[in-house]
Amino acid sequence: MAIIKPFKGIRPPQDLVEQVASRPYDVLNSEEARVEAEGNEKSLYHIIKPEIDFPIGTDEHDERVYAKAAENFQLFQDKGWLVQDDKENYYIYAQTMNGKTQYGLVVGAYVPDYMNGVIKKHKLTRRDKEEDRMKHVRVNNANIEPVFFAYPDNDKLDAIIKKYTAEKPVYDFIAPGDGFGHTFWIVDREEDIALITEEFAKMPALYIADGHHRSAAAALVGAEKAKQNPNHRGDEEYNYFMAVCFPANQLTIIDYNRVVKDLNGLTPGQFLDALGKNFIVEEKGTDIYKPSGLHNFSLYLDSKWYSLTAKAGTYNDNDPIGVLDVTISSNLILDEILGIKDLRSDKRIDFVGGIRGLGELKKRVDSGEMKVALALYPVSMKQLMDIADTGNIMPPKTTWFEPKLRSGLVIHKLD
């Protein structure tokens, strides 16, 4: 069972939300944040990317930078740019992209559920990234940014969400840059709060979609605080961390593609011949070719597109990891032919989120920066959940979720 609770969110006043809200900390670098926050003292970047308040080149992991985050968080509250709600609520956060809307419930997720596997992971985390986020949670004593969860589809929750979203929202705006819509409601009726809590309690699992490092950091700080408190009861606010939970059937994972600098000493002809061992290779011409389904790949090389279809026997349908197209392409193309053993560390490979389109792959190859591009059919939510349920970990750079959660719509304090 998944334990959740409502919380007293800290939020911007309605007329300030567009100035406060920002992209998540990990989708842009310090210089990009500096540009986006220019002339806007109310931008959340002053809290989640506080190095922008220091001279260019300041180490973002400097202790003074973390301290600045806490100072700015307090300043935002003192100035009334962030205000805490009087009572504990759940919240509904809707995101609209390309005419499609997904509706998430903003809740306090339970730290022990993360520790005991009710909250399921599909990705490995790096200790240095965990420690960075842990410091941020500690100094602010808050989850400034939410994590992104999926839950099994639930008709009763759908009905509650439908009821509230028929009413006037608290926030409703289009984000600059990407043009995605962000809409927000407060779930404040006690009977609805109770029903949401009950429905989550019936769920065997919740799934981290995006935000593995934030989840790990929030849970580790919560456990740390429990250990440090001699009067720990288990119901304190630090036992919970902020998550936006979406029904799995509303979520779309988009493709996460690869570009490689060279052919590992092979000529284009030799490379295509080598591919023929494990794939049916078909030339598709100069028009962009998109993978048509699982086990079909799109290759761009020397101004031409190719279809690659994995031959029978090159993958195992009964292996939840082995059947993934990222595994097939990593093993049979990147490793076996191109000599790329470690996707995380090899400098010859880069990754391009599908949000940029296959035209971005063509552009990077045509520019001469890269030699070859490989586009993959996206992973399904069912595959992600099956892998998490079996305790497996997806290969690196497998999932790309879009739209990203906007930060700054609501914050969860740990006391």
What are these regions (language model features)?
Residues 1-415:
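Surface-exposed, charge/polar-rich loops and edge strands
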